[in-house]
């Protein structure tokens, strides 16, 4: 049997979610190792001492330790099209920084008020709302840009769902809900038991 790439993943991590979405989008199959972050398997730390997920170990021994590198490996040619890089920078820097301080204010010494960071995220979502007039982030069809962003918008929405639903960002809500209800996203969130170093193989997608 041909060796498959190995993906170390954590189901709820937005970075791991977007890596799994890219794998599904590209019809890739991997061996999946579901990680509990407080109980990381030794093999993960041997491949990637920083111990974060996702990590993709390729059959040739190459190790991809960042979600964007995994997405590039999955769908490289699509990632040469459009201005998705600007969206990545906005999401992974400004939006994620404020999202973390909104969701986990006690973890950050430099955090301002919860409302401050929530409103900073909302400013970005308002810009997304205008961009989504065409249905998706880069026009009228699902692209890599949507897969990059939706796990983080979902995390923001779920932090205080009642508040989120009161905001005037109808395009964002429609876009997010449409993706979350899609077979692609539902498949990306399939539950796996925690993987141990001596467990049998588990494959993604199932």
Annotate the PLM regions.
Residues 130-140, 184-188:
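Surface-exposed helix-capping loop/turn segments at secondary-structure junctions
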Residues 112-115, 161-167:
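Acidic, serine/threonine/proline-rich low-complexity intrinsically disordered regions
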Residues 96, 133, 161, 181-185:
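Generic structural signal for secondary-structure transition and capping sites
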Residues 116-120, 124, 167-181:
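Extended, well-ordered alpha-helical scaffold segments
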Residues 126-131, 150-158, 180:
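Catalytic cores of nucleotide-enabled group-transfer and carboxylate-activating enzymes in metabolic
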Residues 137-162:
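GST superfamily/GST-like fold recognition
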Residues 1-129, 134:
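GST-like domain detector, emphasizing the conserved glutathione-binding G-site
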Residues 192-206:
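Acidic/histidine-enriched, glycine/proline-rich intrinsically disordered or flexible terminal extensions
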